[in-house]
Structures are given as structure tokens and as C-alpha cells.
């Protein structure tokens, strides 16, 4: 590997977004040394995670300028995290590992505290200590190493809670979470700001809005609905279909991550002589919220088109309109103007395009 090779840590690399990010990075022109970390837990079918890893491995086998090394491990294992940082000297860290799911956080709160809070703290501490021995850097074992140059981490649109004002802006207050999952994600932003202020670590949080696409998470509506319809089961549509979601295709999410990670917040000194926190938060969302019933209709059409379901499938007999669930919100709607301003990027994939790609993948993978 060249001396100019950047070393990256991608946590949650067998997850939906993480695996797609690794695949995207393996197409990069500049040489990269990528370490992927994932605990491969059974929150959903681990075989889907193994499938994603196999797709990555096929690409790694033909990669000319990159290396990729996967490690099975947990963010909450501080000794493991510290060892990884000591051995690899990461330039960029993208933390996508987390216990996901709003409703699941009501049933299993411990998993969220361990992964989303303690795990994120371990990452922050490791980033902090990556600066040990700098300047001088004789203690680092790599005279040119300058510590972690950028920590990018997954936040969530759920931090907006029950906010009534739409679209959701990063300037809005986000101190009224309606689920433990949302509270842990907001805590990540607070932790990151603290470490940016105290230790001058450049951090950027990304609030993702309803990510979907091929090989996604089976607990997400589009995937779960497909599984149930195929089995002849009834799908439940919350808030009697009056929810709106800002669906964002996974490739758009990944493109946003790649652009952001390459441009860290600038380190500056304030008038008091102390560092101005090199800290930022952005929304990544399509900015076009879809009514849940319209979303279901498009999904149905694309499942029929792909041959997942027959043309004469009785969809009306398999729908049930039900009340809002605890922890849910009626609307998510991203104001992503800051992302466009600073990085020249706006999500582009339409809901129909994205669901078509999902339906075609589903047909190939399961049938």
C-alpha cells in the first residue's frame, strides 16, 4: 500500500448502510485500507448480514488498490476498540453500528444503552487517544500519523420526536424524544459536541431519514410488508394510513456519507484562545415525504411487476388500518438544504425507482 493510503474504520459494516458504504468505497480511485467491524447480532436474520459480507468479499477479491479486513466484534468491548485503533491508526472513522429500531427499544432498552451509548463512548475515547504523542509523534509508531481526522456517525431523524414544524431543520430544537432509540441518538450528538470541544476532534453527525433499498433491514416497513404479503398475512398500516415518511434510498445515503467524510469541519480557534468545536450535524433525506398509503400502493405495483406477487393478488383483503404505535411519529420530512449548500448534494432516487430495485433484488434473493 502507498504511503498516501488512508485507513478507515467502518463500524456496522455488515449492516444495511455500512455494507453499501464499503462497496461504494471499494470503487474509489484513491487507495484505501478499510477495516470493517460488526457483531453480527440476531436482531434480524444474520444470514442477510452474511450475504452482504459475501457481496463485499467478491468485490474485495477483484479490488486492485484497496484492502479490506472484517472483524467480528462489539462496540461495547472497549479493549477490542482500543486495540483496533492502536493497530490500525485510523484516519477516518464512520460509526454506523447501533442497535436500530424504534419499537424494539421499548422492549429491549439494555441493548440500546450498550451499543448506542457505551459503544459510541468507546469510539470517542479511542478517537481522543489517537492524538496521544502528537506533535512529535514518535510514540505513534508512524511519524506521519496525525490522529483521527474525522469521525462521522449515524444519528437519526427520530431525534426530532414529535416536532410539529416541518420540514425538520438541524436548527430546530430536538430535546423531546419519543423513544429510547431517539434519546440515544440525541445523546450521541451531545457526546460528539463535548469531545469536539474538549479535544478538538472533528465530528459530523448525519440524521438519516427512513432508509430503504435492496438487502435492507427486514424490520423496516417495505421489507416486512413484502414478507407478510408473500405469506398471505395482513399488513398493519399505522395511524390509519395518515403517516408521511421521507424515504431515502440507500445509495443516496451512502453518497452523502462519502461526501461528508472527505470534508471534516475545520479546526478554528475562538477569540478566547480556545478551540471552536469542529462539529457539524446534517440531515440526509429526500425532502419529499410520501403518504404511507401511497407508499404501499407503489410497493404493491412494483412487487407485481417484479413477479414477487401475482397480478391478481387481493391487496385490499390483506390491509388493516390501525392506530399510531408508541414511539412513532406522524411525519418525517428533511430540510437537507445545508447538505446541498456545503457538499453540493441532494438525494435523487425516486421512491418508485428505489422500490423497483428492492423488488427486483427480493425476487432474485428469495425466489
List the predicted regions and their residue ranges:
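Heptad-repeat alpha-helical coiled-coil signaling segments
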Residues: 210, 216, 243-245
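Non-catalytic, surface-exposed connector residues within folded enzymatic/regulatory domains
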Residues: 34, 47, 106, 202-205, ...
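C-terminal substrate-binding subdomain of Rossmann-fold SDR/epimerase-dehydratase oxidoreductases
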Residues: 7, 24, 64-65, 122, ...
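Residue-level recognition of oxygen-bearing side chains
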Residues: 80, 111, 118, 173, ...
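N-terminal Rossmann-like NAD(P)+-binding domain of SDR-like oxidoreductases, especially those catalyzing
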Residues: 1-211, 298
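Conserved alpha-helical elements of sugar-nucleotide-dependent glycosyltransferases
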Residues: 17, 221, 291
Amino acid at each position: 500500500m502507498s504511503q498516501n493510503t488512508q485507513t478507515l474504520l467502518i463500524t456496522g459494516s455488515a449492516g444495511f448502510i455500512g455494507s453499501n458504504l464499503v462497496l461504494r468505497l471499494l470503487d474509489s480511485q484513491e487507495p484505501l485500507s478499510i477495516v470493517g467491524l460488526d457483531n453480527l447480532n440476531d436482531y434480524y436474520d444474520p444470514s442477510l448480514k452474511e450475504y452482504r459480507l459475501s457481496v463485499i468479499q467478491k468485490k474485495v477479491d477483484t479490488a486492485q488498490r484497496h484492502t479490506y479486513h472484517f472483524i467480528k466484534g462489539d462496540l461495547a468491548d472497549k479493549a477490542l476498540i482500543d486495540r483496533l485503533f492502536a493497530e490500525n491508526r485510523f484516519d477516518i472513522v464512520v460509526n454506523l453500528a447501533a442497535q436500530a429500531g424504534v419499537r424494539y427499544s421499548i422492549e429491549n432498552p439494555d441493548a440500546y444503552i450498550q451499543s448506542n451509548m457505551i459503544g459510541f463512548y468507546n469510539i470517542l475515547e479511542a478517537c481522543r487517544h489517537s492524538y496521544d504523542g502528537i506533535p512529535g509523534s514518535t510514540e505513534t509508531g508512524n511519524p506521519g500519523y496525525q490522529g483521527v481526522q474525522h469521525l462521522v456517525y449515524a444519528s437519526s431523524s427520530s431525534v426530532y420526536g414529535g416536532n410539529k414544524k416541518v420540514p425538520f431543520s438541524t436548527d430546530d430544537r430536538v430535546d423531546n424524544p419519543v423513544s429510547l432509540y431517539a434519546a440515544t441518538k440525541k445523546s450521541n450528538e451531545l457526546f460528539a459536541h463535548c469531545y469536539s470541544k474538549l479535544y478538538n476532534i472533528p465530528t459530523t453527525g448525519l440524521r438519516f431519514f427512513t432508509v430503504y433499498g435492496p438487502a435492507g433491514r427486514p424490520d423496516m416497513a417495505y421489507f416486512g410488508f413484502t414478507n407478510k404479503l408473500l405469506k398471505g398475512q395482513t399488513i398493519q398500516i399505522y395511524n390509519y394510513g395518515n403517516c408521511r415518511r421521507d424515504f431515502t434510498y440507500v445509495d443516496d445515503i451512502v453518497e452523502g456519507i462519502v461526501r461528508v467524510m472527505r470534508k471534516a469541519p475545520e479546526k478554528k480557534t475562538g477569540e478566547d484562545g480556545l478551540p471552536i468545536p469542529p462539529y457539524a450535524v446534517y440531515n440526509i433525506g429526500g425532502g419529499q415525504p410520501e403518504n404511507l398509503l401511497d407508499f404501499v400502493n407503489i410497493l404493491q405495483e412494483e412487487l407485481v411487476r417484479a413477479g414477487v406477487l401475482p397480478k391478481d393478488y387481493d391487496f385490499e383483503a390483506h390491509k388493516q388500518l390501525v392506530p399510531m404505535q408508541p414511539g412513532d411519529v406522524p411525519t418525517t420530512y428533511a430540510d437537507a438544504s445545508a447538505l446541498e449548500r456545503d457538499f453540493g448534494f441532494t438525494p435523487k432516487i425516486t421512491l418508485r425507482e428505489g422500490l423497483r430495485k428492492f423488488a427486483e433484488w427480493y425476487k432474485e434473493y428469495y425466489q
